[in-house]
């Protein structure tokens, strides 16, 4: 029961992030462009089998560098604009994952002010692919809001990792690295980051550890978890005390993902009957095996919703003109559609980068330095099955107003797993109101969040 209660606590942390904010247009565009590349005849990632991640290829040597003094050097004194009375420690800096290539990943770590010595350790990953997890730190579930007095959640000690190299402040001194980035290299580097980070923060080596994330992190989270699972079997390897994974509105299976998108768009009055009928008539595989008409209707399906936030179909947009940014701030839901522009401005200030121990650079929400994404499996459901047999707690949660990776996609993917139901669909509540719904399967839990996007 302890493990289940802990997972509920971690899920609550992620859900509050969803209830407070709804998503980022640039991250939506990154995933949208990535998925459209799969449907077009343009160069797209190699849709390989998940089986590359196995006992042989998923094992990595103990690449551990000396970390003495690094934790103290990474401690943040105060961030510009930080409120008075902050009663927790936070850190940021780089962990080298390949000294020969000069490749290093940037992280921000916030300790819990309450019970930090016993609360679990959580790794948070934003998706994209190629989008920064500092979006999560400063807009979703981190301790601060930029230009906003947002709530703070202190249920865990959280690492926000900018991954892969080329995203945010993370970098490589070998430019060819940016031409060979994909799921494989991202999982490898994230694992090497973790074993070195635990050397830097040895007090967390035995702590219960959870991996969480959203969107394309449906790939990142599961592949990293399985990499840890494989390497934990090796002798003389750093043992990571992985207890579970939590994925929000995650892209985990191409076929059910696309069907879920198009069914959601039609049932939420964002697509015409004609377009929906065309999708169902000509769409079978959602790749180049389908007739040309399928591609035509797919384009119509993506264009018909118009200029809305795909990650929250009911949210206001940030109104920009040449002289200012106009915000339609919603004090009830604590949601400001312009918050990402504040973050973009804040993280590009020289004094902020200095306080974060970041290399002086131009920070962006999503990377344009990574030239291509070279590999991506069409489904990671087999990896989820393997993780289930290992005894890990697996939670999939979904905001019900996200049209990019909608609840329908998640439900269709779970149906594909053919899992027996342990506890039937039921509401869960927050502040005496229904916050969403939960259904427990054998080895997996599904949670929905009302009026929330990614």
Model region roles, listed by residue range:
Residues 2-454:
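Terminal and linker regions of secretory-pathway proteins
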